[in-house]
Regions:
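Acidic, low-complexity, intrinsically disordered peripheral segments
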Residues: 19, 88-115
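Charged, solvent-exposed structural "stalk/scaffold" segments
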Residues: 39-91, 104-105
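Sec/SRP-type N-terminal targeting helices
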Residues: 1-59
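Short flexible/disordered coil segments
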Residues: 24-35, 85-100
Length: 115
């Protein structure tokens, strides 16, 4: 019986160590996901600024096109640049939302439960 008690104590200690390891892993995962979320928000803001710049560039290009100072190819390039910057914003929003949902799931704010 002394052996059983000793084995039980060792098993309990092993379980406690595993529990602590899991808690550290979860905590690190949450911290990493939060940092990733902050980075995606920064990227989103940068992409929003890029849209403003692209819109200003397009507006100037449109004026110059109307005045006949640039070719239709240059005008089309400005259109494409504006479209690409708007697409990049949408992609950044999507990425930020995915990371936000992952963070909420990790912190228990949302659960994957079917009702």
């Amino acid at each position: 019986t002394k052996t059983r008690v000793a084995n039980a104590k060792i098993a309990l200690e092993n379980q406690e160590i595993l529990k602590e390891e899991q808690l550290v892993t979860i905590e690190n995962t949450i911290k990493n996901t939060y940092e990733l979320y902050q980075n995606t928000l920064f990227i989103l803001e940068a992409q929003n600024q890029n849209v403003i710049t692209s819109q200003n560039n397009f507006d100037r290009t449109q004026e110059r096109f109307t005045l006949g100072q640039i070719t239709s190819i240059e005008f089309r390039l400005a259109q494409i640049n504006l479209l690409n910057s708007k697409t990049a914003v949408n992609n950044a929003k999507y990425d930020a939302k995915l990371i936000e949902l992952e963070l909420l799931q990790l912190t228990g704010e949302i659960l994957n439960i079917a009702f």
